Amino acid sequence: WLALGLGIGSGGTLLLQHWTSTSATAPNAPADRQRPPAALTTELLLAGEPAMGSSDAPLTIVEFSDFECSYCRRFHEQVLPSLQREYIDTGLVRFIHKDLPLPFHRQAKPAAAAARCAAEQNRYWDLYSALFDQQTCLACRGVIEIAKEINLDTSRLQTCMQQDTTQTLINTNLSEAELHNIRATPTFIIGPSRSDGKHHGNVVEGALPWPQFKALIDQQLNVE
């Protein structure tokens, strides 16, 4: 996973119970050395966030991710297809994305804005996938060229990206991550679905291999 280099103020001191491992200070730690799951003791807000899957699914997974993060791409390539096929498409899991663009990734925030704006054209997940698929091209080509390749209305997209409301959505995600001491990408919060637009659960850092990620899902579903 990749870590966000931000200090957490006193408002976040009792919100997240983290167990520390030897990888805690490594900015580029291997995916198999992430911290063990911890409990998020207060709630995330889900209203208006991009969601995949049924709102009636018994389990919700919230992802904090960065479009330039290599471990986030690994999750997209090696885990999400199986997750979608076995759990999202079958109505067992609802998958929700939140943005955590890290400050040293210059294209991450524009990519997050573009994806948010693709939702206006009902194409959020299409651009989400394209951005990860072409991650190595982000810096040299930019998000607009990638959006053009999947036939998005790029004029409309650019207008939306420049709006204050779009930046506010991303900054709200960043503030929420800081509040909950979520500093690494990708980070997942896995817990039972609720009807009040809020979420809490176990916090998992890193792009786990699919068998390990699947085991965590099955464990949560068996608790239900």
Please place each PLM-identified region on the residue numbering:
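A short beta-strand-turn-helix
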Residues: 42-59, 87
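Alpha-helical scaffolding within the catalytic cores
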Residues: 47, 79-81, 175
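Short extracytoplasmic/periplasmic juxtamembrane "stem" segments immediately C-terminal to an N-terminal membrane anchor
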Residues: 26-47
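Flexible, active-site-adjacent loop/turn segments at secondary-structure boundaries
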Residues: 42-44, 50, 73, 100, ...
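Short clusters of hydrophobic/aromatic residues that line enzyme substrate/ligand-binding pockets
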Residues: 51-52, 138, 204
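Short, well-ordered turn and helix-capping elements at secondary-structure junctions
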Residues: 48-49, 99, 165, 174
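Structural alpha/beta surface segment adjacent to cysteine/selenocysteine redox centers
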Residues: 57, 62-149, 153, 180, ...
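C-terminal cap of thioredoxin/glutaredoxin-like
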Residues: 1-21, 26-30, 64, 145-224
